[in-house]
């Protein structure tokens, strides 16, 4: 019986020590920074949610501070426009239809602008009028040094007057975002049409030059001496050529027999077009 009270007393002491150790884990002394929280301690769900909210607030404060510093460093007002309305429509279309492959960084790299410009374009819902589009595009093209022949806008009194044929606006400025997929096909079709027109022009020029050359050759043929253009019967008889321009039978016999009269002909005959000459350059006959 005397042993049992000691056992009970020892059990109570152990329980008190255990309770005091558990309490030291949860209760911290004010002003004491030496004790660190136990990483193995299982926090309550409410405490975890509180920590998540605190971390989110810290991140939000950092972002707000960064935006303030950035606005102070940058120039006031909207940044200068560097994209045409056609390019902005293409950016919106690519991001809307192919958002996975065309992310904001890739769009910024493809259009050679910063990611902030891409975000401003995607965030903007402003729909300008045709006059505003033309004015802004003209400014952008002048700034980048690629000013094209954009038609001048009519005055305030001529707003209801349609543009003439020479002042028709380029179709690339009027295509909406839903039709941006057909721009590449239309551009290639236009290039093919230009190539076909160039080829047809070249072919026409070649045919004209060829006709001029043939006409010049015909004029050269007609421009011959009278004796050669209209040979007399005496010349025909001497050369053995009949009225058709072909050698006579007698002349052929003389050529075959080698009796060429006073002229010495070679057995080798050279053909030049429709005329035949010997190796010495003497005219034989014409076909």
From Swiss-Prot:
Tell me the GO BP annotations in alphabetical order. Answer: cell differentiation; mitochondrial ribosome assembly; positive regulation of mitochondrial translation
Q: Where in the cell is it found?
A: Nucleus; Secreted; Mitochondrion membrane
Spell out the molecular function terms from Gene Ontology.
Answer: rRNA binding
Q: Where is the signal peptide?
A: 1-23
Write down any Gene Ontology CC term.
mitochondrial membrane
Please give the residues the UniProt entry marks as glycosylated: 202
Segments crossing the lipid bilayer: none
Which controlled-vocabulary keywords does the entry list? Developmental protein, Differentiation, Glycoprotein, Membrane, Mitochondrion, Nucleus, Secreted, Signal
- What InterPro entries does the record tag this protein with? NGRN/Rrg9
Q: Where is this region: Disordered?
A: 149-169
Source organism superkingdom:
Eukaryota
Q: What is its main location?
A: nucleus
Q: How does it assemble?
A: Forms a regulatory protein-RNA complex, consisting of RCC1L, NGRN, RPUSD3, RPUSD4, TRUB2, FASTKD2 and 16S mt-rRNA. Interacts with 16S mt-rRNA; this interaction is direct.
Concerning its family, UniProt says: Belongs to the neugrin family.
- PANTHER family annotated for this entry? NEUGRIN (PTHR13475:SF4)
Task performed by this protein: Plays an essential role in mitochondrial ribosome biogenesis. As a component of a functional protein-RNA module, consisting of RCC1L, NGRN, RPUSD3, RPUSD4, TRUB2, FASTKD2 and 16S mitochondrial ribosomal RNA (16S mt-rRNA), controls 16S mt-rRNA abundance and is required for intra-mitochondrial translation of core subunits of the oxidative phosphorylation system.
Name under which the protein is recorded = Neugrin
Species in which this protein is naturally found = Bos taurus
């Amino acid at each position: 019986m005397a042993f049992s009270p000691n056992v009970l007393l020892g059990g109570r002491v152990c329980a008190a020590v255990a309770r005091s150790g558990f309490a030291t884990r949860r209760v911290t002394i004010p002003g004491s920074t030496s004790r660190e929280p136990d990483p193995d301690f299982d926090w309550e769900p409410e405490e975890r949610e509180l920590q998540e909210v605190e971390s989110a607030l810290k991140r939000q404060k950092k972002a707000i501070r960064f935006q303030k510093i950035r606005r102070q460093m940058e120039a006031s007002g909207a940044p200068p426009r560097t994209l045409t309305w056609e390019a902005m429509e293409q950016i919106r279309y690519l991001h809307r239809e192919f958002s996975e492959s065309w992310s904001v960084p890739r769009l910024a790299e493809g259009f050679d602008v910063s990611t902030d410009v891409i975000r401003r374009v995607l965030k903007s819902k402003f729909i300008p009028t045709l006059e505003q589009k033309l004015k802004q595009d003209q400014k952008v093209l002048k700034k980048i040094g690629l000013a094209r022949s954009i038609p001048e806008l009519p005055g305030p009194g001529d707003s209801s007057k349609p543009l003439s044929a020479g002042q028709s606006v380029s179709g690339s400025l009027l295509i909406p975002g839903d039709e941006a997929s057909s721009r590449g096909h239309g551009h290639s079709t236009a290039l093919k049409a230009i190539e076909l027109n160039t080829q047809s022009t070249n072919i026409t020029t070649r045919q004209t030059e060829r006709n001029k050359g043939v006409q010049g050759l015909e004029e050269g043929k007609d421009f011959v001496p009278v004796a050669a253009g209209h040979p007399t019967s005496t010349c025909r008889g001497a050369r053995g050529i009949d009225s058709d321009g072909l050698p006579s039978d007698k002349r052929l016999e003389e050529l075959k027999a080698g009796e060429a009269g006073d002229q010495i002909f070679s057995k080798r005959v050279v053909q030049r077009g429709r005329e035949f000459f010997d190796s010495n350059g003497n005219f034989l006959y014409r076909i």
